[in-house]
Amino acid sequence: MSPNPLPSSEVTSSDRDLIVLARWMAGDFSNAKQAFDNPKDYAHIHVYFRPLPFEFFSGIGLYSEQVYDYDLWRPYRQGVHRLVDWGDRIYIENYGLKDAIFYAGAARELSILKTITPDCIERREGCSMIFKRDGDRFRGCVEPGNRCLIEKKGCQTYLDSSVEITETTWVSLDRGMDVKTHQQVWGSTFGPLRFEKKESFDREVPTLATDGNH
């Protein structure tokens, strides 16, 4: 996949933060150490973020998969993400995939990734994430309003999600909260998942003509 550069005249400091975040996200993350140290509490999971071509959103986008290490071809979560410059923050629109199983493995096989088109996705309303840079890391959380609704265990819940990312790590905590009682229904009760980057796909992120990397 050959990324297209953004014109230098359009590059701002907030654009650079957006590109840095995209590059840090682009990779194969594994919580192998956490799962090995605490096998009763944590399964071994991979989180993949693979850059999409610039033309997909006329901007920066990523495809993601979350899979158990023992079953890499059957992701339990897939998505497409569009990064949007909000000045001092970065807004990530989240999209679901229609017939998602057809694209399983796209994070590892570029031939599958190329079959994903804008017609394949639909916006997950209320489920966007908002990130802000904090020195050597970005911190993000789901947009306010408790509108990212997910039905599980016969209960209507909203997503409570927080993420911290550095160049080499991804720490996330996703919990489903009852819309009426605000009590946790699903998600980790042992604390956040802690991932380390095993492989980077940062070279596939569209480049900036005057990019200073960090």
What would you call each of these model-derived segments?
Residues M1-P5:
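N-terminal acidic, proline/glycine-rich, low-complexity intrinsically disordered segments
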Residues E10, D15-V20, W24-D28, A32-Q34, ...:
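Calycin-type beta-barrel ligand-binding domains and close structural analogs
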Residues L18-R23, G27-F57:
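Short, solvent-exposed loop/hinge segments that bridge or flank secondary-structure elements
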Residues A43-I45, S58-I60, R77-G79, D88:
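A generic structural signal for short beta-strands and their flanking turns/coil linkers
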Residues V47-D69, W73-R74:
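N-terminal glycine/threonine-rich, aromatic-flanked beta-hairpin/loop signature
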